[in-house]
């Protein structure tokens, strides 16, 4: 007989959440490091450091939006399943 439920599938909600959390934490650290690099008196108007900060903030924003979208999609999925029960 075919196995209906496999308790150890490749992707679970926990693995997705952990992967997103790791990426968000790394992006947050990158933004904080870029801000610290700008805090010197000579670095405040350095175009290269400002561009790097902007890039890090954009990357953080994209990861945050992906995290929000995935979380919302999973919530909607669970609501749909529960409504049909």
UniProtKB/Swiss-Prot annotation:
UniProt subcellular location: Secreted; Cell surface
Record InterPro entries: T3SS_needle-like, T3SS_needle-like_sf, T3SS_needle_YscF
Domain of life the protein comes from: Bacteria
Keyword annotations from UniProtKB, A to Z: Coiled coil, Protein transport, Secreted, Transport, Virulence
The keyword Cell membrane is annotated on this UniProt entry: no
GO biological process: one example: protein secretion by the type III secretion system
Pfam hit, one: T3SS_needle_F
Family matches, as Gene3D superfamilies: 1.20.58.90
Coiled-coil intervals: 13-41
GO cellular component: cell surface; extracellular region; type III protein secretion system complex
Signal peptide: none
Function, in words: Component of the type III secretion system (T3SS), also called injectisome, which is used to inject bacterial effector proteins into eukaryotic host cells, facilitating the establishment and dissemination of infection. PscF/SctF forms the external needle filament that protrudes from the bacterial surface.
Domain-level remarks: The N-terminal part (1-11) is species-specific and essential for export/assembly and the function of needle.
Assembly: The core secretion machinery of the T3SS is composed of approximately 20 different proteins, including cytoplasmic components, a base, an export apparatus and a needle. This subunit polymerizes and forms the helical needle filament. Forms a stable heterotrimeric complex with PscE and PscG in the cytoplasm, blocking it in a monomeric state and preventing its polymerization.
Entry similarity comment: Belongs to the SctF family.
UniProt protein name: Type 3 secretion system needle filament protein
UniProt organism field: Pseudomonas aeruginosa (strain ATCC 15692 / DSM 22644 / CIP 104116 / JCM 14847 / LMG 12228 / 1C / PRS 101 / PAO1)
Origin organism lineage: Bacteria, Pseudomonadati, Pseudomonadota, Gammaproteobacteria, Pseudomonadales
